[in-house]
Amino acid sequence: MGLMSLSGRPEHVRRQISAAARAFTEGKLLPRVDVLALQEADMRTKRTGGHHVAEELAAELGMHWAHEAAGIPRGVKPVKRQWWLDFEEPIDLQDTGDTGVALLSRLPLKDVTRIDLPWQECQWRPRLAIAATISVGTQDVRIFNAHVDPHAAVDGQLAQLEVIATQTEATTLPTIVLGDFNTLSRQKCIETREFLEARGYTTPFPTGTPTWRTTVLKMHADWIFVRGVKIERWGVAKPLNVSDHWPIWAEVAVE
């Protein structure tokens, strides 16, 4: 959300959370959501008016939820970023809130795991993923939701995905790996796709599908990869403007 003033911030964010909840249930721009993955899910920061986004959105949706905070270091100034990433309102250096990743689900979440990712390029924003298991009928499915560093070169991003891939190899369950991979160049898209496909994952999203935008740029940042289950339908929920990302969605068939 690009907001310039703290005046009225709590009410504005409350309305945005409610708008997102409606979009995820009314079935117009995307099917009714059963599992929702959030990245940059703020928890009582000034920029979100003190709201806990994951908790409040889960309450409106009637979902179970799990959130892992990034653990942003206090008082550490952010490093200079690429110009196309510099529009984001930063979290205040002394803000007592935090951001993070979250999973929301209509089914109970089991075996919730925090996964810390190696991060070098952006010393003020630790990177992480969250994993959890849901039971669809008699079949368990493991879900990994990651927020990859946009500042890192391809090798740095793949090093983060390697940590997640190692975690996925520890389970024999069908697996979904998704999130904001910040593949903000065609080369990053290609190498990320090749990395996961080499490990048995598939995705229906064509390389270059716009999911993130500024006023002048549209890029493919967000992905859903699966192994052991099948994606039957998929899409990008445009023009749902509750974030600088358009939500991506997939209907997954579990045998």
Task: Tell me the role of every PLM-derived stretch.
Residues 1-83, 87-94, 98, 255:
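N-terminal, active-site-proximal structural segment of metallo-dependent hydrolase catalytic domains
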Residues 20-48, 70, 104, 132, ...:
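Active-site beta-strand/loop signature of hydrolases that rely on acidic residues for catalysis
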Residues 1-10, 113-115, 140-149:
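Active-site-proximal beta-strand elements of phosphoester/diester hydrolases
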Residues 46-50, 154-157, 237-238:
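Short, solvent-exposed loop/turn segments at secondary-structure boundaries
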Residues 97, 101-113, 124-145, 252-255:
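Beta-strand-turn-beta hairpins that frame and shape the catalytic cleft
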Residues 109-120, 133, 155, 162, ...:
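Metal-dependent phosphoester-hydrolase catalytic domains
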Residues 53, 61, 97-100, 126-130, ...:
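Residues that flank catalytic or metal-binding motifs in active/ligand-binding sites
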